[in-house]
Amino acid sequence: VVARATDSFLYENWTDVSGFRMTDPRIVPEARLIEEITYSELRELAYMGASVVHDEAIFPLIEPGIPINIRNTHDPENKGTMIVPDREAVHPVCGIAARSGFSMINIEKTLMNRELGFALKALTVLKDNGINFEHMPTGIDTMSIIVKDEELGTRGDAIVESIKEVCHTNSVSLSRGLALIATVGK
């Protein structure tokens, strides 16, 4: 907020790490440092669990386009990670992240793609039960709805039955205990 109010040309965030890594260093200890990343790419990585800086903390800096430099107080010579409005995509993927704790509702219906409002019907069942969806990959006759396990709770079977009833599907099934893996980049 201060960086924006003072029209700063750069905001430095000093922390205990040298910036963002291409993947979780607890899983891949030799993960390379990301030298430059966009605000949007940062938000994707933060959503998936990267915790160097909270994605909402950058909002005041996005509109004026103030770059953020994540630096390490224990290694001040390290250049860290620059978070910028846009970047040249030297490498298309800048990071890979994962989050566990998801379920997938798998829906199959012949000619689903020709039925106006089909996805809306399925999503309305979730909305009526207070459940957000995280992701929704689709095919011609299939749709998968990814939801958080904690939001689904013990209502999985009831949700499956409601979708079957409302959408008149060939089949609906539920897969629990899944993780989302995201590649982030341009």
Whereabouts are the PLM-identified features?
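C-terminal catalytic "cap/lid" subdomain
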Residues: 1-186
